[in-house]
Amino acid sequence: PPLDAIQKLIDADKDIITGLTTSRLDESVLAFWKNGYPEQDQKREFLKNSPEIVEIDGAGLYLTLIKRPVLEKILFNWNSIVDDAEFYIRARVLGYKIFMHQGILCKHFRDKENYYLPKI
């Protein structure tokens, strides 16, 4: 992510805000959803016609800033395969809005051998 990513998220002053993230396996895939699970071309069109900070339904939790009161109210299920989606669903059920900052692009880190995690 850009060096000022965290500061941009703080400055947005939202309860829950994330950067624009890509899929782990295919960086051309935008990892967020709005009004269901739109196709990639629909996501790009939505973003093109939206302000820099846009309300979404959910995304990956790669670079997400969450205010403490939100975390204190939401029980996070770490064992879920879709823990990020589940977190956003729980937040929305409690009435929280989720925002995404288009000016922050975050990709998964990979080492020179294209591994996501250290070899054991």
Where does each model-flagged region fall?
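Conserved catalytic core of nucleotide-sugar-dependent glycosyltransferases
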Residues: 2-79
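Amphipathic coiled-coil/heptad-repeat helices and related helical stalk/stem segments
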Residues: 1-2, 84
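C-terminal catalytic/acceptor-binding lobe
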Residues: 68-69, 73-120
